[in-house]
């Protein structure tokens, strides 16, 4: 039964746990800037590890939300370097991941095996705004007279505050609405949803894990013998091209006749429109902007005044000297 016992590498579908750890433990938020660039990590007694982005292209400074939408490997590796693999493992356990996880930096790219059941369970914790529900198969057993012999009375555990999870949930909605999982929308799926693609080296594993308000579903595609998945056009099958379409077709059937329910926005959350490449409040100089969900106490700064072309004689000297020292976040 591959759904429960097939420990396959999740690839980038593991990244949400890295991002959540960085936001909860190290003060990052969806508008935080990380430089997307080639990374070289020295390993004692071995060759350096040089994780690459899928396209081998790099965006430079970019906000976390956009980095997740584009599934940028270098950003995820930089985050786990800062927060440590131990903290990411601890976070994954809070989401219900029970498989052994390697205590190493490559964990950021999903190099430890998990089951689809674990991923569906973990992603349901995001959809439930931090409430973990242990998976179960049998809800109730009755005898021939209808008397209950067994009932499952498990109640969810609030492992994270709702306002801690919602920024991540919003980022994962971005994956579907305009990121690597956009095929879901292109296929006509209308329900509010979040998710994440995953593809492993040499196209041996293709994942799409996603959720709506009603269901959390994990789709894995691959061969038992680890053979690479190559289509008739000699293209490797990715999470977006193989698993996400299956997820979409399944969820369309599962949600047939159900209302399109939006995710509730918890108390303590606000939305800000920011510059994708500076992390500052959007302004007339912004090339690309994006709405991000952040905790109310999060301060998003305007662009530093010295970077805005102005007529200097229109500014009072006291105002200029005060604001030119405001750093770019």
Q: How should these model regions be labeled?
A:
Residues 1-17, 30-33, 37, 106:
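Short active-site loop at a secondary-structure junction
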Residues 1-6, 14, 66, 115-291, ...:
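A penicillin-recognizing enzyme superfamily signal
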Residues 1-8, 50-55, 63, 74-80, ...:
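Second-shell loop/turn segments in exported
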Residues 20:
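Extracellular glycan-interaction surfaces
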Residues 23-31, 98-100, 128-133, 257:
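Secondary-structure transition/capping motifs at alpha-helix termini
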Residues 28-88, 132, 144-174:
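Conserved catalytic neighborhood of penicillin-recognizing serine enzymes
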Residues 46-52, 83-121, 135-137:
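Mid-domain, small-residue-enriched loop/turn segments at the edges of structured enzyme/sensor domains
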Residues 309-328:
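C-terminal functional modules
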């Amino acid at each position: 039964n591959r759904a429960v016992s097939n420990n396959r590498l999740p690839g980038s579908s593991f990244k949400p746990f890295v991002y959540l750890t960085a936001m909860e433990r190290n003060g990052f938020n969806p508008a935080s800037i990380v430089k997307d660039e080639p990374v070289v990590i020295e390993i004692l007694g071995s060759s350096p590890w040089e994780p690459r982005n899928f396209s081998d292209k790099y965006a430079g400074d970019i906000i976390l939300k956009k980095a997740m939408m584009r599934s940028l490997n270098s950003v995820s590796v930089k985050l786990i370097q800062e927060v440590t693999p131990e903290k990411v493992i601890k976070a994954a356990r809070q989401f219900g991941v029970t498989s052994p996880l390697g205590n190493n930096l490559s964990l950021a790219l999903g190099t430890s095996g998990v089951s689809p059941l674990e991923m569906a369970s973990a992603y349901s914790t995001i959809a439930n705004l931090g409430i973990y529900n242990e998976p179960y198969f049998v809800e109730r057993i009755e005898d021939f007279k209808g008397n209950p012999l067994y009932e499952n009375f498990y109640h969810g555990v609030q492992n994270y505050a709702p306002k801690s999870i919602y920024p991540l949930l919003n980022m994962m909605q971005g994956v579907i609405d305009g990121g690597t999982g956009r095929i879901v929308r292109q296929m006509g799926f209308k329900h509010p949803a979040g998710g994440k693609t995953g593809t492993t080296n040499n196209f041996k594993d293709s994942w799409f894990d996603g959720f709506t308000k009603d269901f959390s579903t994990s789709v894995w595609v691959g061969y038992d013998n680890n053979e690479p998945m190559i289509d008739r056009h000699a293209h490797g099958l990715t999470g977006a091209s193989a698993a996400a379409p299956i997820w979409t077709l399944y969820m369309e059937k599962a949600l047939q006749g159900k209302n399109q329910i939006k995710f509730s926005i918890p108390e303590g959350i606000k939305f800000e429109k920011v510059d994708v490449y500076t992390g500052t409040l959007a302004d007339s100089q912004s090339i690309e902007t994006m709405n991000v969900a952040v905790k109310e106490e999060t301060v998003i700064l305007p662009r530093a005044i010295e970077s805005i072309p102005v007529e200097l004689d229109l500014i009072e000297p006291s105002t200029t000297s005060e604001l030119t020292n405001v750093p770019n976040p």
